[in-house]
């Protein structure tokens, strides 16, 4: 993917979208996340990088309570995530998530996949939900696929449907968990281009990815994780050109060719 200077978009200096304070998570005796502290401002675009098993996907899954943290605090759009199911639902309504695997319903058409949540969760009338869905399918450049089923689409097209489906809920924050890692190389660019478009419109984004060209182009900040900890974070130019931590230097030397 061709690299370009990051566009100077408005990032709120005062409005916090996500705040994580001393967050820890265990799987049994395994300490998967250690004392995570992170503040994401409205409109900020953050790329989270790191080796497999570093905890990066687990961290963003905690942001919409797909994973439960055992210690510390997570506040999303002013709501603290606890065991309160009502608060969890409040957060999930405002946070879209796109996964490595598309998670589309195979027995529903593309249009039906996109209208399901707005109709059932937002209580949107069907006609309005279909209009919203077509708007976002046009935005990700696949409106002609609306009446097809997921199995009739390429992997790149299915991932763009997954992005459109999330946008139909009008989220304030988008989380991406390695959205291109399951795609064939020739399909990666079409998905990244869609994500670049979202970033250019000012969407608050946290993205776990190994696509470092995307990080250079889009991110306000790149975070490097290893062994369940945030090891280093900086603006893209400083992160890539002058990494401070030896573990970051080693990772970049292995991933950048």
Curated annotation (Swiss-Prot):
Gene3D superfamilies: P-loop containing nucleotide triphosphate hydrolases
Pfam families documented for this protein: ABC_tran (PF00005)
ABC transporter domain span: 18-252
InterPro entries, sorted: AAA+_ATPase, ABC_ATPase_HisP-typ, ABC_transporter-like_ATP-bd, ABC_transporter-like_CS, MetN_ABC_transporter-like, P-loop_NTPase
Cross-referenced SUPFAM superfamilies: P-loop containing nucleoside triphosphate hydrolases
Residues the record lists as binding ATP: 50-57
CDD domains: ABC_HisP_GlnQ
Transmembrane segments: none
Protein's UniProt keywords contain Metal-binding: no
Keywords: Amino-acid transport, ATP-binding, Nucleotide-binding, Transport
Any one GO molecular function term: ATP hydrolysis activity
Primary role: Part of a binding-protein-dependent transport system for L-amino acids, affects the uptake as well as the efflux of these amino acids. Probably responsible for energy coupling to the transport system.
Family indicated by similarity: Belongs to the ABC transporter superfamily.
Protein name per Swiss-Prot or TrEMBL: General L-amino acid transport ATP-binding protein AapP
Phylogenetic classification of the source organism: Bacteria, Pseudomonadati, Pseudomonadota, Alphaproteobacteria, Hyphomicrobiales
Name of the gene encoding the protein in the UniProt record: aapP
């Amino acid at each position: 993917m061709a690299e370009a200077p990051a566009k100077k978009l408005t990032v709120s200096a005062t409005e916090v979208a996500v705040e994580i304070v001393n967050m820890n998570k265990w799987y049994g005796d395994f300490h998967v996340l250690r004392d995570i502290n992170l503040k994401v401002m409205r409109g900020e675009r953050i790329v989270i990088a790191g080796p497999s098993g570093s905890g990066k996907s687990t961290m963003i899954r905690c942001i919409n309570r797909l994973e439960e943290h055992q210690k510390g605090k997570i506040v999303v759009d002013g709501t603290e995530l606890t065991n309160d199911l009502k608060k969890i639902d409040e957060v999930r309504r405002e946070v879209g998530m796109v996964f490595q695997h598309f998670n589309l319903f195979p027995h529903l058409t593309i249009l039906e996949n996109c209208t399901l949540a707005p109709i059932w969760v937002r209580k949107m009338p069907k006609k309005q939900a279909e209009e919203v869905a077509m708007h976002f399918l046009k935005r990700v450049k696949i409106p002609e696929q609306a009446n097809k089923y997921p199995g009739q689409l390429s992997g790149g097209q299915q991932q763009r449907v997954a992005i459109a489906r999330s946008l139909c809920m009008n989220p304030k924050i988008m989380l991406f968990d390695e959205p291109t890692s399951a795609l064939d190389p020739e399909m990666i660019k079409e998905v990244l281009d869609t994500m670049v478009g979202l970033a250019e419109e000012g969407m608050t984004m946290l993205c776990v990815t190994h696509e470092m060209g995307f990080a250079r182009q889009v991110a306000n900040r790149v975070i490097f994780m290893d062994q369940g900890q945030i090891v280093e974070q900086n603006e893209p130019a400083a992160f890539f050109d002058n990494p401070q931590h030896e573990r970051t230097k080693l990772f970049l030397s292995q991933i950048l060719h």
